[in-house]
Amino acid sequence: MDRLNNVGGETERELDEKYPNRPRNKHSTLPFHDLFLTLFNPLNGNKKRPTGPAAARKKLGPHGGQQTLSPQELRRDIIQRFISRWRKEVGNDIYPAFRLIIPEKDRDRAMYGLKEKTIGKLLVKIMKIDKNSEDGFNLLNWKLPGQSMASRMAGDFAGRCYEVISKRPIRTDVGNMTIQEVNDKLDVLAATSKEDEQIPVLEEFYRNMNPEELMWLIRIILRQMKVGATERTFFEIWHPDAESLFSISSSLRRVCWELYDPNVRLEADEARVTLMQCFQPQLAQFQMHSFPKMIERMRLSPDDPTFWIEEKLDGERIQLHMMSDDSIPGGKRFGFWSRKAKDYTYLYGNGFYDENGALTRHLKDAFADGVDNIILDGEMITWDPEQDAPLPFGTLKTAALSEQRNPFSATGQRPLFRIFDILYLNDKALTRYTLRDRRRALEASIKPVHRRLEVHTYEIGNSAADIEPQLRKVVAEASEGLVLKNPNSPYRLNDRHDDWMKVKPEYMTEFGESLDCVVIGGYYGSGKRGGGLASFLCGLRVDEAQVRQGASPMKCYSFLKVGGGFTAPDYANIRHHTDGKWKDWNPKKPPTEFIELAGGDAQYERPDVWIRPDESVVLCVKAASVTPSDQFRLGLTVRFPRFKRLRMDKDWKSALSIQEFMDLKANAEREQKEKEFKIDNSRRKRAKRAVKKPLTIAGYDESKRAGFTGPSGHVFEGMNFFVITDSVEPEKKSKLELEQLIKANGGKIYQTHTAAPNTLCIAERRTVKVASVQKVAKESIIRPSWLFDCIKQNEVDKGLPDLLIPFEPRHMYFTVKSQEEEIARHVDEYSDSYARDITPNELSKLLVSMPLIPNLPPPHISKTETQIQERESTFQELRGWLFKNQVLHFVKRRSDSMLSLPLRLASNLARFAGASVANELEDKSITHVVIDTDSQPADVSALRSAISKRVAAGRRIPHLVTIAWIQDSWKAESLLDEERFAPTA
């Protein structure tokens, strides 16, 4: 029988002491090949099945055939059968299997340090292949353009290895290695770092496995399984509390060993943070509301309506664990983890005397007497002692490594841990205590170490008016933003809640929050960008509702194409992370499992190559605004998208989803109507259509357009109607037919307008009853055309919540005085609806009714230019349009009487490329304030203070950049992200 000899560097005796009640398997683990024969291959086969609604299933019973399962049900059935078999034939300890099924979640096994190229090199030596042969070249150079595309297994390194191994296998039948034996050998492999130590381990696998087993082994080593099911599905089927426990511990071992019996639920006390176990922290909610509404959403206590205002730090979210341990010099052991559960203890130190620790060696006096153990939540930032100011996030790791080499430098950049919460103190979890109580415990436990470990400060707010001065300060200091916190709230693990809210300043010409989109396609460039991918197709992942209906969780809708804002290093970085994973786009066999384009068979914006979302990268993209587009599957895209940065801390699962974007868009539109200072946003419940004027009734959202599938059947639900006459236009319907139509769509029919409250009167011609209602003048009379328009619009919006379109003047047979003005606001000056798709006939009449304008004023010309630029992508590539729509203000140094030569050259260059130049800083249209690269810090600070006054005026804030932004953008032939060119002060 297999025995667990070593897990995560611990002996079996140590594990027995740590987990005395862990389950023991009664029999040997299953053969390794059973993993792919009974689990991986069936799951992959299920991925290839066409998806469809679960409703289209055969019925069970004496007259029904065998039930046809939906792909999602079949996926669960495959996993359930494997788990049931394991429990029956092996035992309750499924940890050995889960380590190989979801290896990317196994934190107990060290990283192998083996990437594709290294494995290819080792296989060439093990199989004694000539490195210059076709197979040798393909293994060693699999990333080279053209090589991977020639293979049937293109983009799949493990599949490439399978092809090569299949030509020279030692075994053709499956081997007899068990799952536990494979785990034992992988533990040995993880403990090695030299080639001469790695080769014997891989040679043993080669001798005892056939090509298919080796292919799956390589996928396990690379942690790239692609089995058509996420860890969430495995966790849900294993135990109902498995995902919750993993969220608070990030420990696959705890999930398997503490939750082996599905009938024994996790106790509340067990679902708490634990020392030296990485948890998933609480996150701040994005909101786009006016300040009073944000405070309202925090649901502050009437007895204590105060809230806290903290500066949002530009660093990395880190949790610090400290406990007493006599085996560590100094008696205290430390652990550091990121939000994504990456262990950074090696970087910041495991004890007071860790010579490699960039932080812990400075913390000997950081804790109050009596603190034996503690868990702190905070932000690790980079601090520059010379400027006595924080530096951008991208410099953090460099600063930490520099601190390791020279720990007592007084001038070098260093990591600084700013603490804003405490979760655990002296064996007691504090998550259920209020933030105010936790802060008291934090301040009593920590003795700050200047510019090494500090408690993050906060301001107390009593009303919305207290937020604005703090936001002005943030702008003046070029900080990230603010976080508002409810001091009476508990700590909510792995949750994003209104108790904490982000507030970011909204800058000119940008659409609120950055969009983190997964790359799904690529387009080859021309000219100076020829020979490589120059622009990328980004998508939005589908939501849970579509997954439940059978869609692949990885499926993405095409959303935007971005080719601006990239520098040569940016392209190189993306290439590094995606080389070898691209596949040629085959129009006859599009990858519909992963990507859905607009246009059906026409395949609008079809990329040259595509990539699986789980092998791709996430780009942070900024844009000017959202605009309708039939070229992208979402029905929407963004104007002037620009690359901001590569989000290596995110993957396809955490990239923006369709619903998340629609929520973001709805919030942006709602706040656009308010005359208050606006902030960045993210999540709400319902997305609304972009409109020209404020609406009182929600309109139609083109972004979620669905094909015609008939009336939704609920559009008039909860409404009362009194149909008085038949219909003549646009359809001839009798009174009875109109009543049937209303009832079929959820409405109720009455034969008088006084029988039920809020009854709508429907009529199109004058009768005695119509005249009677009209004479009383208490009820408006609506034409039947409104019924038809509502039903038709909801057919177009199939799949969205049913919404009524607002009344238009054309819908009204008679309007009471109190409603006339409101209804008139639902159309523009030409009677074009803001919320409804008009028909071609209506559009034709509308155009005829418009007066001719022989001479267009400048604003109209500018608007036309913008529309041309939006529709013609080639205009964006013209250097003469590079700074179009940008308004720049150039600031001379206080010691100069006129602009310096570099500033004048930059100004001329920007104007040549389409920019406008504003002479006064007070100009409301300014998008960028440009200064010289050698401006003095005092001048920069003064300028930021002046710009911050825009906050009080409720205006957006211009970017503050050096002339390098203009120069480098001109060289790159693309507008680059402004944050890279912000001056330091």
Swiss-Prot record:
Record-listed E.C. numbers:
6.5.1.1
Q: Name one GO cellular component term.
A: DNA ligase IV complex
Record field: compositional bias (Basic and acidic residues): 10-20
What are the record keywords, sorted? ATP-binding, DNA damage, DNA recombination, DNA repair, Ligase, Magnesium, Metal-binding, Nucleotide-binding, Nucleus, Repeat
Reactions catalysed, as given in the entry: ATP + (deoxyribonucleotide)n-3'-hydroxyl + 5'-phospho-(deoxyribonucleotide)m = (deoxyribonucleotide)n+m + AMP + diphosphate
Q: Chief localization class?
A: nucleus
Instruction: Give the region (Disordered) as residue ranges.
Output: 1-27, 43-70
Task: Write out the biased-composition intervals (Basic residues).
Answer: 46-61
Q: Would the keyword Kinase turn up in this protein's UniProt record?
A: no
- Tell me, what is an example of a GO biological process annotation in this record? double-strand break repair via classical nonhomologous end joining
Tell me which residues bind Mg(2+) 2.
E480
Describe the family membership recorded for this protein in Swiss-Prot or TrEMBL.
Belongs to the ATP-dependent DNA ligase family.
Enumerate the NCBIfam families for this protein. Answer: dnl1 (TIGR00574)
Descriptive protein name = DNA ligase 4
The UniProt gene name for this protein comes to: LIG4
